[in-house]
Amino acid sequence: MADLLDKIMGSSSSNRIPKRDNRMNQDKDEPTSKRSAPMFSTPKSTTPIGRDSFATMDTMNVQMNMFPVDIKDMPHKIQRFQVDVIVCSSNGKQINANLGVLAAKGDVNSHNRRLAQYYIMRTVHDKLLVKFSGKSHHFLAYDCAATLYLPEGVYTGDDQEEVTLTIDDFPKEEWKFVSKLSRRKDDSYLVVLKPAGFVYTQGEVAQEEANRMELTRIIEIVTSQKLNNEDYLQFGNATFPRLSPPHSEPDAISEIRSGFAKVSRLSQNGGGKAFMTVDTKISPFYKDTSVIKFSSNKLSEMKGGGGGRGGYGRSDSRDSRGGYRGGRSDSRDFRGVYGNRGGNDRYRDESRGRRDMYDSRRDSGSSNGADYSPSDAAELEHAFGERGNTKRCIEEALKGLDVECTHLKGNLIRVSSIAENNAENTSFMMKDDKGEREVTVAEYFLLQYNIKLKYPRLPLVVSKRFKHESFFPMELLRIAPGQRIKVNKMSPTVQSAMTGRNASMPQHHVKLVQDILRDNLKLEQNKYMDAFGIKLMSTEPIQMTAKLLPPAQIKFKGQTYMPDMSRPAFRTQDKFVEPARIRKIGIVVFDNCIQMRQAEDFCDKLSNFCRDNGITVEKDSRDWSIRELNSSDSVAIQNLMKKWLDDRVDILVGIAREKKPDVHDILKYFEESIGLQTIQLCQQTVDKMMGGQGGRQTIDNVMRKFNLKCGGTNFFVEIPNAVRGKAVCSNNETLRKKLLEHVQFIGFEISHGASRTLFDRSRSQMDGEPSVVGVSYSLTNSTQLGGFTYLQTQKEYKLQKLDEFFPKCVRSYKEHSKTLPTRIVIYRVGAGEGNFNRVKEEVEEMRRTFDKIQPGYRPHLVVIIAQRASHARVFPSCISGNRATDQNIPSGTCVENVLTSYGYDEFILSSQTPLIGTVRPCKYTILVNDAKWSKNELMHLTYFRAFGHQVSYQPPSVPDVLYAAENLAKRGRNNYKIHQRYVNLQAVENRIIKDHSELINEDMREELAAAIVDEMSVAMNGMTIPKRNFWA
């Protein structure tokens, strides 16, 4: 009998494991935790193109964090309903809560909104119970937004049902959440249900793309219904148990929390099967702390030696535009009227009776139990009084956070900025029973709330809603718990905690997933799943057979090197295959970190290292330029780089005390805006290169980067002949011509900004950050890389400006190799199946540029989506040992069929060597294959390309062009922040507005933002060094 995976994939397998029907029948009535997981064998490629070009070197048995789900008992049809929740305000206005008008941003509001919608639907069910055939609420699968699903036949109501809900329809503890949708206690809610068609679970129509995607969504919603309570924080498919203690606490204002992600997918061949992937997650959260303690901590970070990249030690350069700058204002509100109702009530849910994390405050938040000392507040007052970078850095840290007003029973506000003025020098006109008079903010709080401010000289916190600004004393605010720390706001301490000791080993990882299935998802004896006919077949992970791919062959100048299979890191003393040839080197010593005599000696040493590696430097080291500069003098740095570029200096070597100081990003910014190559070394690195102890490895690492930055190539990647005495392929020369000759590789990566980029007309400035696109492309030889970055406005998945930048890549190849590529392989960082159509649109835009490149030009495109953040994990079937290298799968492990993307070939590949924690493999989906290469060929080609990384001499997790594109996107993000610091963006925006006055209206905000972003992109990247791996 055919193996289960063969049935799912619709292909045969040469290594079938028989399905044991008798055992399955015996286990039928056993709980899922007692049943064995089905054993899967890996079938061959579903692409019917050619035979396998590469032989199987070795295999290993693996397990994945995927679990089989039986859906054959689901009703034939699931009825879909459109749900409209309309807020009926006491002032007569009606607003549809699902249209985004009320959709406040932020994690706290997302949590509150989800619970409010859930309680509303539960109450609607109770009121319309007869029209739901008297069925329990378990027959409702609600996405807590605009869509409801029911098994066919359950609903017996009309084509439209309306229910009006008021405060009297909810228990007090539920109304507390429901009222937060409108933030007014006397509003009512009109809920409108409209049948909106069916979703099919069986037959051919069930396999149509739109139906298949929605059926997958139903399975996701049904299996997540038990998470709709206040015990869990949900963000997309990530869930974090609220009551669990934090995993760790990196500092006084942050904590690392453990959670999980769950993703469901249908099997490709139907058959009533689906798969659920469950993975662990960790995420940093802000602690429940006072705003003064938070700000004091950020002040300490700023003073603590610069903070390094990612911290707040460096000025983030954002303007504080939009803050209140006057001495008085008649229209400002100091009462926090936009906050929510407070209280310490309890409310019911699936478990009934737990306390809401956002409304129950600890004693430490009271005036008698402050979590900061008077000296902390005094130091903060002094720092703000000195101006400088304090306000800008703390404002950037606070901006966008939800904070609670302790004087308003925990009402929430969102921080927009920090005002220039404080509670003593900010006044407004107040009306009361004594008439109208001018009062300061400090006086107002004493009169209105009987609160005498202890620190009235701290700046006021501004919260903006629409065009109205409210001001709040800092000492009356607390950071609301349950908010994740965004990547761009993580301090170095938090970043270290996320990547170091918190990484779980595979053995522990597998156990954690089992705990999640049992304790959190509770998929056994689940009434929601029973109502929809969904059954978890086993809580044991599926077993598969993976291939171990051979490493690439590495060619240096004098020898060809074959890395060890599964342990591919390699070292060699051979010379670079293409050493750079340069004219002159310039040395800059920052902040007197080394003596001038030592700098001169370093020039001699560096000259020797260049000669040893075959790098030609025309000018003698005694003729190199050496300068001493202050690292904070950006003007002097800029002028020197311009002068040296005119003097034909090829590369600037900057020496600083720290490994990644502020000046590092300044150098990289001017590198792309001026066009002079740079490399930054720390004092310790220079000492190692000058001395003997431990210096060899340091010298090798530096020279590998140095050669690339100067235009050389360290080694070439080739298709191997044999590994471990076994032939890899029948003819590697034939495959070389097929897969590498006249083939260009291009990688695309997007780094999104903090929010969607639009033009905010009310403040006359950009709102949010642009996205940064990193692009890397290969030249004549596939390991010779060039690249660039550019900005685009919208925080969306689709690449923009391809008509300009795709031809740029191809023309660079032609200029270098004197011919156009006949095949172009594109590696595109991607998300899930739902985004494939947008990538296809990108492909069509690329095709439309062919004639622009050259009339009649028609190369074959191969487009591969790389999902680095895929939740799929691969472990050895038998995990043993204590080290990460023992417990993880080795480099080159490849699972050919991963069952999740309907109609596309895909594979999971782990290229990197795991050194810590659990390896995260990358999932690849072959979206376009004009060249008709087999999946066997593309699997091996992808692994070979990972060896192209020219610095570490071992493969990273993705192919070299994609790894380079990722680094370029990061570089572009840093450059944007530096650009904000040194360029008056307000002046740029005003000039663009003047030139595009026709765009100044609400409907054209995106077009105006695009014009501003294009201007910045040209200014930042106009002198990018072409056809060179300058970012190494």
Swiss-Prot record:
GO molecular function: miRNA binding; RNA endonuclease activity; single-stranded RNA binding
Expressed in which tissues: Expressed in the nuclei of male and female germ cells.
Record flagged with keyword Oxidoreductase: no
Region of interest called Disordered, as start-end residue ranges on this chain: 1-51, 298-375
Main location: cytoplasm
Region (Required to recruit the small-RNA amplification machinery to gene targets and promote gene silencing): 1-551
Function, in words: Argonaute protein which is involved in the endogenous small interfering RNA (endo-siRNA) pathway and is required for RNA-mediated gene silencing (RNAi) in the germline. Interacts with secondary 22G-RNAs in an hrde-2-dependent manner; 22G-RNAs are RNA-dependent RNA polymerase-derived endo-siRNAs, typically 22 nucleotides in length with a 5'-guanosine residue. Plays a key role in transgenerational epigenetic inheritance and germline immortality.
The name this protein goes by in its record: Argonaute protein hrde-1
